[in-house]
Amino acid sequence: AGGEEMYQIAQDMVTMLREEEGCNYVICIGHLGIDDETAVTANRSIDLLAKVTGIDVFIDGHSHSTEEEIAEKTNADRKVGDTVVTSTGTKLENIGVVTIKDSTITTECVPTEGIEIPADNEIAARAAAIAAEVEAEYGIVFAKTEVTLNGEKAPGNRTEETNLGDLITDALVWKATETGETVDAAITNGGGIRATIEAG
């Protein structure tokens, strides 16, 4: 869903949470972002919040924005209507903190640089075991390609048909036909194709 349909779904959910569930606060975790790229379709968090009331805090993603960048698109309080918008930037540079005290909501981003957390040996061992399984699986050659398969964003899978997108959807059709049903077509999200596969 997007645009007006998305706004209505969000508003219905907020109404249900407040009126039927009796929630005092509604905190929305979303992946809409504030970048100009999505402004064309009016699918940014700030577009949604201009149409939806009753959300106290919107914890955003997608555009990897900092609170300073959000303030540039909104105001010094990072508010759209009564909703505070927050986001932690990118690559775990910050840890987001939302505090609700005496009906006052504040948000902040705590930089992770310099924070040291002691390793948990049990978790480290489990993570290493999973990584070994993945590496073993990735090491198996199951196919070869004579051409480079385009996994680029633009120009590429987000802007046009590509050979890697074709391969993926052909594979989806092939697998789906194993159900015995007639399959006419398959569609894949260009945003889910993340890397080029070199010839070889």
What are these regions (language model features)?
Residues V26-H31, I55-T66, T86-T88:
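Active-site neighborhood of phospho(di)ester-bond hydrolases with catalytic His/Asp-centered motifs
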Residues T53-I55, G81-D82:
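Glycine-enriched alpha-helix->loop->beta-strand junction motifs that scaffold or abut catalytic
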